[in-house]
A protein has these predicted regions:
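Low-acidity, Ser/Thr- and Arg-rich intrinsically disordered low-complexity segments
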Residues: 7-8, 14
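His/Asp/Glu-enriched, well-ordered alpha-helical/loop segment
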Residues: 380-390, 397-421, 426, 431-435, ...
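Short, Lys/Arg-enriched N-terminal segments with co-localized hydrophobic residues
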Residues: 33-46
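Non-cysteine beta-strand/loop elements that form the S-adenosyl-L-methionine
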Residues: 118, 331-349, 442-452
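Divalent metal-binding segments
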Residues: 49-56, 60-62, 66-320, 346-394, ...
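Acidic (Asp/Glu)-rich catalytic clusters
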Residues: 299, 323-329, 438-439
Length: 591
C-alpha cells in the first residue's frame, strides 16, 4: 500500500518526502517481491530506520488464501510492520546494525484478538475481590464463598461468578435461604456463569432496595415463591440493572489494578487486542470503563489494544465522544455500538421461532429482552449516522429479526462505509439465514468454547433437528462468511489455545468430550481457526486495515509459539506455549 502511494506521487514529491531504501515485501498471492518502500515522515520514524527484524522458518501471515507457514522475515519500524519477505532480502535491505531476532522453527503469527469479552468482569473476576467458581452444588458453592469471604476487605460485598445450576448435583435452582444462613449480615451476590442471572441474599436485596413489591425493568424479572416472597433470583435486565451497584465498593484504584494485572495475563496468552463489549442494555450500566483505560494509558500501563463497544442508546453522544477522543490513539478506539436482543438458551430466554423442546410453560419460545421495534429504531438511527452495531443474538428468532433490521438499514443507508455490522453468539440459525450473513456483509462473531459449555444442552432444549445447525464454522467458511472468534470472558476463560482447540476439534478443552467432536462436520482446519482469531476479529472491530495479518503498514502485533498449530496433532494444541508476545513492536511478554 505504501509502495502504491509512493508510485502515485510525482518524482519531485517522492524525492522531497524522503530518501528511499530497497526492501522486500509479501504480496497477497503469497509471492515474495522486491519493491521500493519509503519511511514517510508522517509514520513518525527517522529515514531508513528499522528497530528490529523478526525472522522464523514458520511465519503464518493470516492473509486470506495463504494457509501455510513460510520462512519469512518481518521488519518493524516504530509500531508498524514495514516489510515482510525472504529473510536474506529483508536483512540485506536494512541498516547493518539492525537487530535480528531469529526464532528458528518456532511459529510466528499475528497477535490473537479476542473479538468478544467483558473486560471489567474478566479483570475483577481474576482479582482477589471476586470468586470465580461454578460449584458442584448449591451447598458446596456457598461454603466456598464463605471461605473466600474471610480475606475480603471490611467494605467488600461477597461476590462470586460462574454458577450453573443445571450442572450441579442435584441440578436445583438456588434460593436466598442458603446465602442468608451463611451471610446473615453481609451482602452476598452470586453472578451466574452465563452472565444473565443474579442470586442474592436478603442483606443484598435490602441494600439494593428490592422488595416483593418492586417492579422489574422491562426485559427482566424477579423470581418469587408461592407466597409471593422473593427467592433471591433476578433475571436478565433485572440482574443487569442491579449488578453495577453490587460492585460500587471496588473503587477506581482496585479496578485499575485488576485491569493491569489482566492485561499481563492476556500477553501471556499471546492476546494483543480485545473487543470490550457492553454487558448491560441500560444507560450507565455497560461496564465499558474508558476512564480506567485512560488512567492506565496515562500511567504507561496500558498493555493491550482495546476496541470499546458501549451500549446503543437513543443518545449516541457517548460513542461519538469516544471516537473524537481516540481519533489519534493507536491503542484505544470506539468502533461502534453493542446491542442486546435476547437471552440464553439454558435459561429459555433466547428467542426462538418455535417453542423449546422442553417447554417450562405452554408456548415457551423465549423472549426478546428488548422489543424488536425498539431495536429497529436504535439500529436505523445508528446506521443513519454511519455507526456499526454488534447485536447479541442466540436464538433463531432473534437472529432472523436482527438480519431483517440490518437488511432494512442497508436498503435505507447502504452497507457501513467503515467497519462491519456483526452478530454475536448466533448459536442456532434458520438455514436460510446463513446466506443472508454473506449478502449483508455481516460478521459472524462466535465463541468456540461455548460449543461444549452445556453438554447435552442443545439437544435437551432445542431437539436434534435444530441442534444440527449450531455454531456452523465449516459452513460459514464454505459460504464465504467472515468469522471472528473470542471467549465471551468471563463466561469462558481467556485461554487462547482452548479457543483454537475447540474450534478445530469441537471437543471440550477440559474433558475432551465428545470423541470425534460435537457435530464433527463443522470442524475447521487450523489455518481457518487462526485466521478467525486474528484477521476475522479485526474485521469485527472494523480495523482490518491495521490489524489481523502480518503485512506492511499494519501494526506490529505478533505472537511466537513453540509449536506449529498448522502441522501438529490438534490434541497437542493445548500443550503449545506462548514464547513471546509483541504489541506495537514492543516485547510485552517472554517466556
Amino acid at each position: 500500500k505504501i509502495v502504491q502511494a509512493l508510485s502515485s506521487m510525482p518524482p519531485a514529491a517522492r524525492a522531497g518526502k524522503a530518501a528511499v531504501c530497497r526492501l522486500a515485501f509479501c504480496n497477497r498471492d503469497g509471492g515474495v517481491h522486491s519493491g521500493v518502500l519509503n519511511f514517510l515522515p508522517e509514520m513518525g520514524m527517522p529515514m531508513q530506520h528499522i528497530d528490529r527484524i523478526i525472522r522464523s522458518k514458520n511465519v503464518f501471515t493470516a492473509q486470506d488464501g495463504i494457509d501455510t507457514a513460510r520462512e519469512l522475515a518481518i521488519a518493524i519500524a516504530g509500531d508498524r510492520i514495514v516489510a515482510v519477505g525472504k529473510p536474506d532480502d529483508v536483512i540485506a535491505a536494512a541498516p547493518a546494525a539492525t537487530p535480528v531476532l531469529d526464532y528458528g522453527e518456532q511459529f510466528v503469527c499475528p497477535g490473537f484478538h479476542d473479538a468478544h469479552l467483558h473486560f471489567f468482569h474478566t479483570s475483577v473476576g481474576s482479582s482477589p475481590y471476586m470468586l470465580m467458581d461454578m460449584g458442584t452444588s448449591e451447598a458446596a458453592l456457598v461454603q466456598h464463598a464463605l471461605e473466600f469471604s474471610q480475606d475480603l476487605p471490611d467494605d467488600a460485598w461477597v461476590v462470586t461468578q460462574g454458577w450453573r445450576d443445571y450442572r450441579w448435583d442435584p441440578p436445583e435452582h438456588p434460593t436466598k435461604a442458603s446465602l442468608d444462613a451463611a451471610f446473615p449480615d453481609r451482602p452476598c451476590v452470586m453472578y451466574s456463569g452465563d452472565g444473565h442471572t443474579l442470586w442474592l441474599n436478603s442483606r443484598a436485596l435490602e441494600a439494593l432496595g428490592v422488595t416483593r413489591d418492586s417492579e422489574p425493568p422491562a426485559g427482566g424479572s424477579y423470581d418469587k415463591d408461592a407466597s409471593g416472597e422473593l427467592t433471591g433470583i433476578a433475571h436478565e435486565a433485572a440482574a443487569m440493572q442491579l449488578l453495577p451497584r453490587c460492585l460500587e465498593w471496588l473503587g477506581e484504584g482496585r479496578i485499575a489494578s485488576a485491569y493491569a494485572d489482566q492485561m499481563r495475563r492476556m500477553a501471556e496468552q499471546g492476546i494483543t487486542s480485545i473487543c470490550d463489549m457492553s454487558l448491560m442494555p441500560m444507560p450507565g450500566c455497560d461496564f465499558i470503563r474508558d476512564d480506567v483505560y485512560d488512567k492506565l494509558q496515562t500511567a504507561g500501563r496500558l498493555g493491550i489494544r482495546a476496541h470499546l463497544f458501549p451500549t446503543l442508546l437513543d443518545d449516541q453522544s457517548r460513542l461519538e465522544e469516544l471516537q473524537v477522543r481516540y481519533a489519534n490513539n493507536a491503542l484505544l478506539s470506539a468502533p461502534g455500538f453493542k446491542q442486546f436482543f435476547d437471552g440464553v438458551s439454558s435459561e429459555h430466554t433466547a428467542y426462538l421461532t418455535e417453542p423449546y423442546t422442553n417447554p417450562r410453560f405452554p408456548g415457551d419460545q423465549g423472549r426478546l429482552t428488548v422489543p424488536a421495534e425498539r431495536v429497529r429504531k436504535l439500529v436505523l438511527a445508528a446506521a443513519e449516522r454511519g455507526h456499526t452495531v454488534r447485536i447479541h443474538v442466540i436464538g433463531d428468532g432473534a437472529i432472523h429479526a436482527a438480519l431483517d433490521i440490518f437488511e432494512e438499514a442497508a436498503d435505507l443507508y447502504g452497507l457501513p462505509q467503515h467497519g462491519h455490522n456483526t452478530l454475536e453468539h448466533l448459536e442456532n440459525l434458520l438455514p436460510e439465514d446463513i446466506d443472508r450473513l454473506r449478502k449483508l456483509n455481516v460478521v459472524a462473531s462466535s465463541q468456540p468454547c461455548h460449543i461444549t459449555l452445556d453438554p447435552g444442552g442443545p439437544e435437551r432444549d432445542l431437539g436434534l433437528e435444530r441442534s444440527r445447525i449450531m455454531w456452523p464454522f465449516a459452513t460459514y467458511k464454505q459460504r464465504g462468511i467472515r468469522q471472528a472468534f473470542g471467549t465471551d470472558s468471563p463466561i469462558t476463560a481467556v485461554t487462547s489455545m482452548n479457543v483454537l482447540y475447540t474450534a478445530i476439534t469441537r471437543q471440550d478443552p477440559k474433558s475432551h468430550w465428545p470423541e470425534g467432536g460435537w457435530l464433527p462436520s463443522e470442524r475447521i482446519d487450523a489455518a481457518t481457526a487462526l485466521r478467525n482469531y486474528t484477521l476475522g476479529s479485526a474485521y469485527a472491530a472494523g480495523d482490518e486495515q491495521n490489524l489481523g495479518s502480518l503485512e506492511p503498514g499494519k501494526y506490529a502485533d505478533l505472537v511466537v509459539l513453540d509449536q506449529n498449530p498448522l502441522t501438529i496433532d490438534p490434541q497437542e494444541l493445548q500443550a503449545t506455549k506462548v514464547q513471546a508476545t509483541y504489541l506495537a513492536g514492543n516485547l510485552i511478554y517472554e517466556r
